[in-house]
Amino acid sequence: MDATRRDLPPGSVVRRRAGRIADVLRAETTGGALLLAGAVIALIWANSPGAAGYDAMRSFTIGPTWLHLDLSLAAWAKDGLLAVFFFVAGLELKREFVTGELRQPRRAAVPIAAAVGGVLAPAAVYVLITAAAGADALRGWAIPAATDIAFALAVLAVIGRHLPPAVRVFLLTLAVVDDLIAIMIIAVFYTASLSVTPLLATALPLVAFAILLRRRVTSVWLLLPLALTAWALVHASGVHATVAGVLLALVVPARPLHEHTAAPSLLERFEHAIKPVSAGLAVPVFALMSAGVAIGGLGGLVSALTDPVAVGVIAGLVIGKPLGVIAVTWLITRLTRTGLGNNLTWTHITGLSMLAGIGFTVSLLIGELSFAAGTERHDHVKIAIVAGSLIAAVLAAVILRRPHRAGPRGNDAIARDPDQARAGAATPRTAPGHSTPAVTGANQPARSPAP
C-alpha cells in the first residue's frame, strides 16, 4: 500500500483523498450531522460567558462597499452561503419534476398544495392567539409560515434512515415551495422599498447563463461571474438573495444532450460537484451563524413563553403547520383521486408535516423585519422559533421512526446519497394479484428516458 502510494504523483493522492471526502459529504447523514453540530455549537456559544465573542464574529463586516455588499458575516451566511444550498435544492427539485417522481402534474400538485396549506394555517393560528395583544403583535403573522429546508432535510436524514425516497422528495418540494411563498410574502408585506430595476436586470445574466448551458458551455470562468451577478442583482433589489440560487438551478438542463446515451445530464454533473460544498461548508456555517439565540436562563425562557407573540409562533409551527399540510393533502387526494404516491403513507405525511414546522432561516428573518432588533419582543420571537422548531423536530422523530421497527429495511436511501439510491426507489403500489410495473431511476437515462 505504502509503496503504491509513493509511486503515485502527489496530485493523484490529493485528488483521491479529496474525492473520498466529497463522497462522504454527499451522504445526507453527514451533511445533517454537520448542520446540527453547527447549530448546537452556536446555541452553547451564544449562552456561554463567551457570548460577546459570538456576537462580535457574527457582526464582523466584510465586502466591497462600492457594491453595497459590505455585509456582516451573519448576512453573508444567510444571503450568500445559503444561496448555494438553494441552488442544490433547486437542482434536485427540477430533476424530480422533469425525470423523477413529480413529472406527473397530478402527483406534483399534492406537495405544492400542501405547502400552501402549510403557509396559511400557521398564519391563521398565530392571528387567533395574538388578536387580543394589539396591532403591533399582529405584525409577526408570517413568522411561523416558513420552513427551514436545510434543517428539515438534515433532521430527516438523521431520523429517517429507512424511509422510502418519496418521503424526501415530498418534503423537498413542500419546503422549497413553502419558502418561495414566504419570500414573496417578505417582498410584498415586509419590504419597505423594492427596487424593480435590479430585479428586472437579473434576467440578463440569467438568460446568458441559460444560453451557455444549452450550448453545453461549462467553463467556470464564464458561468460563475454570471451567477454572482445574478445573485448581486437579486440582493440589490431587496428580495431575499437565496431566490437567485433557485432561479439559476431552474435553467440548468435536466436531460443529457443525447437521451439515448448513458452520459449524465448537466444537472446531475452540477449537483454532484456542488453538493459537497453545500453540505460541508455552506449549510454548517449558516447554522453556526444563525442558530445562536441567547435564551437568558430560566427567567428569560419563562418571560418569552408567556408573551402571546411567542405562544403564537410556537403554536403556529407545532400545530398550524401540520394542520395545514395534512388537511390540504387529504383534500387534494380526495378531490383528484391522486393518492399519496410511491410508498407514502399517512404516517409519513404526519411526520413530514411536523418537519415542516422547523422554522429557522426565513422565520428569523421575518422576525427581524416584524420587531425591531434589540427589543424584548424580538428576543422572545427568536426563543419561540428555536423552541417551536425543537418541539416539531422531536415529534417528527417520534412519528417517523415508528413504522420502521416492523417495516422493510431495504430502502436505506435517505441516509445515503439520494442519487445513488434513486435507482432502487420503491415502485408504485398495485392491487393484489397484479404485477408491479418497472420503474427506471432518474439516474439511468440510458435504460428508459423520461418522456
Swiss-Prot record:
One annotated Gene Ontology cellular component of this protein: plasma membrane
This protein's name: Na(+)/H(+) antiporter NhaA 3
Ranges where the record places region Disordered: 407-451
Species for this entry: Salinispora arenicola (strain CNS-205)
Gene3D superfamilies referenced in this protein's UniProt entry, alphabetically: Na+/H+ antiporter like domain (1.20.1530.10)
Biased composition (Polar residues): 437-451
Annotated GO MF terms: sodium:proton antiporter activity
Catalytic activity: Na(+)(in) + 2 H(+)(out) = Na(+)(out) + 2 H(+)(in)
Biased composition (Low complexity): 421-433
Keywords for the protein's UniProt record, in alphabetical order: Antiport, Cell membrane, Ion transport, Membrane, Sodium, Sodium transport, Transmembrane, Transmembrane helix, Transport
This protein's record includes keyword Ribonucleoprotein: no
GO biological process, one term: regulation of pH
Statement: the UniProt record of this protein carries the keyword Cell membrane: yes
Location(s) in or outside the cell: Cell membrane
Membrane topology, record value: Multi-pass membrane protein
InterPro entries noted in UniProt: Na/H_antiporter_dom_sf, NhaA
Taxonomic superkingdom: Bacteria
Protein family per UniProt: Belongs to the NhaA Na(+)/H(+) (TC 2.A.33) antiporter family.
Bilayer-spanning residue ranges: 32-52, 71-91, 109-129, 140-160, 169-189, 193-213, 220-242, 282-302, 312-332, 354-374, 380-400
Pfam family, any one: Na_H_antiport_1
Function of the molecule: Na(+)/H(+) antiporter that extrudes sodium in exchange for external protons.
